[in-house]
Amino acid sequence: MAKTIKVTQVRSSIARLPKHKATLRGLGLRHMHHTVELIDTPAVRGMINQVSYMVKVEE
């Protein structure tokens, strides 16, 4: 079974770079305090690193 991580949006996407808003949508996050469970891959980790100031990650 693949390792999964929980990602929660903790800061608003209002007044953020369009690229960062698109990254949040790519992660499946729609609004604040929304949590998604994702498979831990290098691509997902890269997306999380890009918006690390807006999300919380639980291993």
Swiss-Prot record:
Q: Which domain of life is it from?
A: Bacteria
Disulfide feature: none
Asked whether the keyword Ribosomal protein is assigned, the reply is: yes
Q: Which InterPro entries match?
A: Ribo_uL30_ferredoxin-like_sf, Ribosomal_uL30_bac-type, Ribosomal_uL30_CS, Ribosomal_uL30_ferredoxin-like
Which controlled-vocabulary keywords does the entry list?
Answer: Ribonucleoprotein, Ribosomal protein
Gene Ontology annotations of biological process type: translation
**CDD domains, A to Z:** Ribosomal_L30
Spell out the molecular function terms from Gene Ontology: structural constituent of ribosome
Q: Which GO cellular component terms, listed alphabetically, does the Swiss-Prot or TrEMBL entry include?
A: cytosolic large ribosomal subunit
Identify one Pfam family in the record.
Ribosomal_L30
Q: Does the keyword Ribonucleoprotein apply?
A: yes
UniProt lists the family membership as follows: Belongs to the universal ribosomal protein uL30 family.
Spell out the subunit comment: Part of the 50S ribosomal subunit.
Show the HAMAP family listed in the entry: Ribosomal_uL30_B (MF_01371_B)
Q: What is this protein called?
A: Large ribosomal subunit protein uL30
- Gene this protein is translated from: rpmD
